[in-house]
Structures are given as structure tokens and as C-alpha cells.
């Protein structure tokens, strides 16, 4: 029994990438990393532990991607001097030496923090609290010792961390005074906010050339943002050498909002010239405190929609950061991989997984399109031509952007399966009325696109759009108007054929099957016509070519313009959807060959006025339908005289034993599918004496606009 291998089948189902890379071609590893793609924007750093800088594979990952390093914990006060005069330099020195050996600048972290500090600085040898002067002397000694030891490799320091209070800053009814903006740490209780100024003064004394940062989490929260702003402004007005603000960036897929992040950058840039994102990770939940501790654990499968939210959050954030490259000068990921993360692998926080392999989000961050960062979207949106009656959304504009509106006030997330560079979809954002809005990150390819909504993990159709069968389900559809759409438009002055449904018996499957038959305007039941058997792709059915593909309108217009001979088109279900990803080890095309050749062709010849000869019969198919076409035409060369593969592979001269056995071969794909292979195959066939034509649809991929144009190009060569 003849079979199509599952490997080949998978290639066809994902043919956009297949054609782009070329069949049989081994993947080429990209030698560039974050530091290369962001060289014109900011340095990209990573927080490391001692294992990261001693394991060869992890070292290679660091050297490829990062041009700034932070010691995650090994330069904190308690790590370096847990007791007065007792210094632990081993790990910090190893990390510093790694940076020296590899010429990677080091971010110093951190000189003064409420946690992981040295409590001995606050008490004497009898346990009594010391004066603030004694505390300052100890703090100065620590800062000078550390800064001087590493000043040759450290280019900046997080001097003071997390000195500001959390909360929204509002005064509760029972409070006599407004809440204190400062964290009630031992430092603050002993010294007030003077300890902040002193720490910066001590660091600047030790290294006047180092950039000095105040660093805090929740720095995009509007209330805390203002507290940080006011404190830093107060310090700078007093002459304290605060050079920059560090926004830690411990975010989650639901927040903070893009608007709050950008507003914080803009506000901070009023008082500092440099902003670093110092501790970036994005977890997949909103848990804090004990709940966050509980959610750590063994890495578990992450639902696809959560991965999309994760990618979108990182993509949105980096777009904002690139937009503010004038002030954002460093972005540091807080750990190398999920395995190292303080959040745990189960929270999925970083671009590298627990095995140090890049996730899809790695490529989302790295392979950005600079043209889209500051793109100006024209506000000339109009309802899609494929909307339900009276539905305003979805919309599209003259540039090819699509905009969506969904009412789901109780939902936590809404994703449209279009956009994000083909990497998952467009994440919508909820307004104050519970309505979700979103616009694709960039223009869509011209033509028809399937899509659906994912609301909190549940897949539903867009109530505003009409439905079309694709992806083995009824999907929503949207049409991005093409510059050349005239060839498939309904025209009042053009005679129209008809599409009729037929039910034909299939003894081989013990069922009655359905086909749609396009009859040209000239069909009157007297004259006989040639026939094209035209197949859909995986996930579709016999409705695809006349609904999504507009095959009937394309033919009407071409016939009216005298561009091709009138012929019949037969469209039936190719039995492709019995194949499931990861399921069967192969696809048996022999069953469909029997249905098509031995049952449908005789039925059509018996019930319609056809020229029942090989040279007046053609078979073509798109994507997986092209695979079927290739297999059946080679298996039954006595049946079809013309072959067409539309994003469905190629023929070679070795396949065609006798050039006279075939009247013509048409090969096509989208211009984004790697057309060189198609064009070369067509030229090779022609050199072998076969009448062959190759075509690449400009600016499209593995999609219906490619196949509409392919039919337009193929039809004139048929039945000559």
C-alpha cells in the first residue's frame, strides 16, 4: 500500500517554513545572539551564579548572547561580609575574573539593601544598637572595600535597592497621617532617608567613574513610581550622585500594563539620563509572596495560549525599550535559564528553558522588525468584507493591519490567532468597560486568513466574522484587501457560471460523498468541456476552493476576458483530515485515489457534459492536496493530462518516465515560501522536454492569496 510518510506530511502542514528553508536542507544555527541584534539599542545582560560561569555549555550561551553580567547573589553584602571583617571573595572573584577573561563588563549588585544585608552593622558586640555614625562607618568601609576591589571591571553599581514602600500610597480612614513613602527597614529606622544619600556618596568616593543606580521592583506601578521619582529628585537636588534608576522588571504575563511601563520610563527620564532594566523575568501567573513560593516546582507543560501571552508580554516590553533607547542603556535578564531562576522552572520566566534551550520567546525578542517599532498605523479602518451582517468588527485598514473588538468582561485573557509574526497571535487588552481591543503588530499578507479567539484557554469563533472550514473546524475568516483583488471580484457585467452540489456513491468507503462542481457560463448541457479536479489542503474540505478561494469567480472573470478556455472544476473532500498531528505513522492516499479516479471521475463523466479523455482532464491541489495530486497523477498517468502542485512540492524528470505522458505541469508557491526550489524544478522539467511552468506569488506565504493567484496563472496553460 502506498503511503505518504508522516515526515513529509508534517512538512506539508507547515509548508510555510518548509519552503522557506528548503526540503532536506539541515537547519543552520544562527551565530548571532542578543548582544548582536541589540548592538544599536542597549547592552543585554544576565544575572549569573557560579555554575553558569564554570559550565562550558552555559559559558557558550553567555558569550553568544550577553555583553553585561550581574552577580545574582555573590556580591550582596551578606555574601561578601557576613560578619565584620570576615570576607568571602571566592565566588565574586570567580565571576569578576570570568568577566575580565571574556571582556564582559560587570554590573555591581548590590551595596545596600534591606534584605540579604549584614545585620551586624546595626549592633555592637553586645547586641546593642549602634549610632547611625557607627553604622555609616561600617557601611562606608564595606562599600569602599568592595568597590575598590572590582572597579577595573564593574561599570555601574546598584547602590541602594528597594528603599521605597509598597502599596498605593493612599491614606486609610483610620490613619492619622499619610503613609510613609519609605520602607520601614532597619536602615530607615536608624537613619531616615539619609542612609540613601550616604551610600551613594561612599560609592562615588570609591569609584568616581562608575554609574550609580537606585534600583527597585514595582517601579512601573504609578504610586510607587511617584515615590521613587520624588526620592531620587530630592537626592539629586541635594547633590547626591544618583546617576540612574534601575527598574527591576519582575513582571507577569498580565501586568504591569504597557502604558504604565512606558509612563514610568518617561517620568524617570525627567530626572536621570540612564535607566537600566536590572532584573527582568516574566512569570506566567500573578502570584506574590507565599503563593509565589508555592508555585515554584518541577517544570510542567505550559498551555499554548499561556506561551502566547508570555511571548506577547516580552515582545511588547522590548518594543517599548527599543523605543526609548535614548535613555534605556541596559536590559538584564534575572538568571540564565528557568533552571536557575528564583521563580522556579514551573513559572516559565525566562527565554531559556530548564535545559538551557531557547524557547520561542527567545526568537520573539531577538528577531524583531525595527520598522514596526515606530510604525504609524493609519486610522482608516473599515469593517472586513467577510463580517457578519451589521458587524462592525473585525476591521482592516489600507496598510493591511487588522483590528479586533471582543466583549468578554469576566475574561482574564483574549488572544486572536493572527499576528505576532506568526508566533501565536495578537493579545488583546481590556478597557475599563470590560471590552477587549487589539490591532495586529504589523500588516497582514494580502488575502484570506483563518483565525479564532482563545479566551482564557477556550477556543471560540469571533462572533463578528463569518465562518469558513479550515484547521479541521469552522474558523472565523478575514480578508485583507489585495492590490490585485479585481481578478476574483463579483462583476455585474460578467456572465457567471454556477457551483452545484452533487452527491455521488462511494462503494469503496460504503458512503455517499459530496462534491462541488463549477460549470462555466457557456455550459448548456450540449457542448462538452474539459475538467480540472481541484483539491484543498489539510484541515479543509470541498467548500474551500469556491468559498475561500473564489475559484468560480476567478474562472468567470478569466473566461470573460478571453484569458482561458472554459472548463469545469470539480472539488471534493480529499480525506486529508483523517490525519492528526502525532497520530498515524503515514497517510494512505490510495483510499482517496480510489474515490477520485474510480468513483468520482466516472460519476462526473456520466452526469455532466465532459470530454472524457486524459488530455482533457487535469488534477491540481494546494498544500497537502498537492501531495495527493503528485501521488495520484504518478500512480495513474493514464487518467490526467495536466498536473498542478500549488505549494505542494515538485516533480522531477525522473518522476516523468515519458515526457509525452503529460501535456503540462504547473508548479507554484508563495514568494515567502522559498520559491527558488519551485522555479528550479520547473526549469529542470523544461530542460527534460516537459511543458512546465513555475510561478511564485509576490509577497505571500502558505495562504489562499498564493493559491488564488496560482489558479489565475495555471488556467491559461490548461487544455491547449
Locations of the language-model features?
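Short, acidic/polar
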Residues: 50-65, 138-146, 224-235, 261, ...
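Structural preference for beta-strand elements that scaffold enzyme active sites
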Residues: 41-45, 68-70, 105-107, 154-158, ...
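Bacterial Sec-dependent N-terminal signal peptides
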Residues: 1-24, 371
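Noncatalytic carbohydrate-binding groove/subsite architecture in carbohydrate-active enzymes
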Residues: 30, 37-42, 49, 54-56, ...
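Substrate-binding cleft and catalytic face of glycoside hydrolase catalytic domains
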Residues: 31-32, 64-82, 90-213, 217-219, ...
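Aromatic-rich peripheral "rim/lid" segments of glycoside hydrolase catalytic domains that contact
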Residues: 27-30, 34, 81, 88, ...
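Acidic-and-aromatic substrate-binding clefts and catalytic sites of carbohydrate-active enzymes
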Residues: 26, 47-58, 77-90, 117, ...
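Non-catalytic cap/lid and distal C-terminal segments of serine-dependent acyl enzymes
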Residues: 377, 390, 397-425, 430-720
Amino acid at each position: 500500500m502506498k503511503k505518504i510518510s508522516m515526515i513529509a506530511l508534517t512538512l506539508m502542514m507547515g509548508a510555510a517554513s518548509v519552503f522557506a528553508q528548503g526540503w532536506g536542507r539541515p537547519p543552520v544555527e544562527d551565530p548571532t545572539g542578543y548582544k548582536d541584534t541589540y548592538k544599536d539599542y542597549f547592552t543585554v545582560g544576565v544575572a549569573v551564579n557560579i555554575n553558569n560561569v564554570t559550565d562550558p555549555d552555559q559559558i557558550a550561551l553567555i558569550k553568544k548572547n550577553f555583553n553585561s553580567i550581574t552577580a545574582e547573589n555573590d556580591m550582596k553584602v551578606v555574601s561578601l561580609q557576613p560578619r565584620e571583617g570576615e570576607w568571602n571573595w571566592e565566588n565574586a572573584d570567580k565571576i569578576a575574573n570570568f568577566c575580565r577573561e571574556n571582556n564582559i563588563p560587570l554590573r555591581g549588585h548590590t551595596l545596600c539593601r534591606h534584605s540579604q544585608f549584614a545585620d551586624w552593622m546595626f549592633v555592637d558586640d553586645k547586641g546593642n544598637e549602634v549610632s547611625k555614625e557607627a553604622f555609616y562607618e561600617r557601611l562606608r568601609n564595606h562599600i569602599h572595600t568592595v568597590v575598590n576591589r572590582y572597579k577595573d571591571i564593574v561599570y555601574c553599581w546598584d547602590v541602594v535597592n528597594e528603599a521605597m514602600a509598597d502599596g498605593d500610597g493612599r491614606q486609610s480612614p483610620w490613619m492619622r497621617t499619610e503613609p510613609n513613602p519609605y520602607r520601614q527597614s532597619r536602615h530607615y529606622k536608624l537613619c531616615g532617608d539619609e542612609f540613601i544619600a550616604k551610600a551613594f556618596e561612599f560609592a562615588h568616593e570609591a569609584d568616581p567613574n562608575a554609574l550609580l543606580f537606585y534600583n527597585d521592583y514595582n517601579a512601573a506601578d504609578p504610586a510607587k513610581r511617584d515615590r521613587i521619582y520624588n526620592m531620587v529628585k530630592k537626592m539629586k537636588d541635594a547633590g547626591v550622585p544618583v546617576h540612574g534608576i534601575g527598574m527591576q522588571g519582575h513582571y507577569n504575563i498580565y501586568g504591569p500594563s504597557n502604558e504604565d511601563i512606558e509612563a514610568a520610563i518617561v517620568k524617570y527620564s525627567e530626572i536621570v539620563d540612564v535607566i537600566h532594566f536590572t532584573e527582568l523575568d516574566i512569570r506566567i501567573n500573578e502570584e506574590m509572596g507565599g503563593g509565589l513560593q508555592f508555585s515554584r516546582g518541577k517544570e510542567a507543560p505550559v498551555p499554548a495560549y499561556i506561551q502566547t501571552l508570555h511571548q506577547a508580554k516580552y515582545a511588547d516590553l522590548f518594543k517599548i525599550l527599543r523605543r526609548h533607547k535614548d535613555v534605556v542603556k541596559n536590559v538584564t535578564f534575572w538568571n540564565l535559564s528557568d533552571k536557575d531562576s528564583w521563580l522556579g522552572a514551573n513559572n516559565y520566566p525566562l527565554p531559556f528553558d530548564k535545559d538551557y534551550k531557547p524557547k520561542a520567546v527567545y526568537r520573539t525578542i531577538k528577531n524583531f522588525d525595527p520598522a514596526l517599532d515606530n510604525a504609524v498605523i493609519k486610522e482608516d479602518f473599515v469593517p472586513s468584507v467577510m463580517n457578519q451582517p451589521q458587524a462592525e468588527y473585525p476591521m482592516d485598514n489600507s496598510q493591511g493591519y487588522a483590528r479586533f473588538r471582543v466583549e468578554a468582561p469576566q475574561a482574564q485573557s483574549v488572544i486572536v490567532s493572527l499576528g505576532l509574526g506568526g508566533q501565536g497571535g495578537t493579545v488583546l487588552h481590556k478597557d475599563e468597560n470590560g471590552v477587549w481591543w487589539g490591532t495586529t503588530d504589523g500588516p497582514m499578507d494580502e488575502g484570506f486568513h483563518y483565525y479564532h479567539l482563545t479566551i482564557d484557554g477556550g477556543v471560540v469563533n469571533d462572533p463578528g466574522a463569518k465562518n469558513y472550514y479550515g484547521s479541521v473546524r469552522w474558523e472565523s475568516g478575514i480578508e485583507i484587501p489585495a492590490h490585485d483583488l479585481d481578478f476574483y471580484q463579483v462583476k455585474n457585467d460578467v456572465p457567471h457560471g454556477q457551483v452545484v452540489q452533487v452527491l455521488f456513491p462511494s462503494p469503496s468507503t460504503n458512503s455517499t460523498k459530496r462534491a462541488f462542481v463549477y460549470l462555466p457560463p457557456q455550459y448548456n448541457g450540449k457542448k462538452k468541456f474539459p475538467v480540472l479536479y481541484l483539491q484543498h489542503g489539510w484541515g479543509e474540505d470541498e467548500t474551500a476552493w469556491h468559498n475561500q478561494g473564489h475559484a468560480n469567480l476567478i474562472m468567470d472573470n478569466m473566461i470573460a476576458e478571453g484569458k482561458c478556455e472554459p472548463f469545469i472544476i470539480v472539488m471534493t473532500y480529499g480525506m486529508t483530515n483523517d490525519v492528526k498531528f502525532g497520530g498515524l505513522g503515514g497517510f494512505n492516499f490510495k483510499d482517496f485515489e480510489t474515490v477520485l479516479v474510480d468513483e468520482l471521475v466516472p460519476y462526473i463523466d456520466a452526469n455532466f457534459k465532459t470530454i472524457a479523455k486524459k488530455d482533457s482532464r487535469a488534477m491540481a491541489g494546494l498544500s497537502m492536496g498537492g501531495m495527493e495530486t503528485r501521488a495520484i497523477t504518478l500512480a495513474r498517468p493514464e487518467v490526467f493530462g495536466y498536473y498542478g502542485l500549488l505549494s505542494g512540492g515538485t516533480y522531477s524528470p525522473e518522476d516523468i518516465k515519458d515526457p509525452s505522458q503529460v501535456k503540462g505541469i504547473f508548479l507554484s508557491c508563495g514568494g515567502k515560501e522559498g520559491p527558488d526550489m519551485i522555479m528550479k524544478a520547473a526549469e529542470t522539467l523544461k530542460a527534460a522536454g516537459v511543458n512546465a511552468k513555475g510561478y511564485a506569488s509576490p509577497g505571500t506565504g502558505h495562504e489562499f492569496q498564493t493559491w488564488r493567484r496560482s489558479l489565475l496563472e495555471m488556467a491559461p496553460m490548461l487544455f491547449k
